[in-house]
Amino acid sequence: PYLKESTFTGGHGSFEIPDYNGFRLPFGKATLRRKGIQPDNVFCCTLTGDSMEERIADGAAIAVDTGDNAIKDGKIYAFRHDDLFRVKYLSRLPGGRVKIKSHNEAVYPEEEASLEGIQVIGRVFWWSVLD
């Protein structure tokens, strides 16, 4: 499903709550399965903010695989952090910590947080925007 009224932010976080409206993006189920993604684990929404630019533009549609929520260093994840919905690169650190990194590092410095304070929703595996 495409959660049209929902946004994740690449900036400092968003309080938007998912609300499915029936709209779907054209991912073929067979294509997703070939990539090891179960179609029932996928949702799409909009990313707002410039912290992931040049990689993912403000306003891009993103696809999230909720079945892939174990952190693999350097991958992009949708996650909840202190009740904010965010999209960033995540990497595990020693001592039960996680590194939170934006693509636009000049504006958004790297952060660290406790793994306990992070709820990984899923890995962002696709994005698209028309400019």
Labelled PLM ranges:
Residues 92-97, 129-131:
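Short, conserved beta-turn/loop elements at beta-strand boundaries and strand-helix junctions
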Residues 1-58, 121, 126-131:
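Short, positionally conserved secondary-structure boundary motifs
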Residues 102-131:
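Amphipathic alpha-helical interface segments
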Residues 79, 100-102:
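SH3/SH3-like beta-barrel fold
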Residues 51-55, 67-70, 115:
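Short, surface-exposed secondary-structure edge patches
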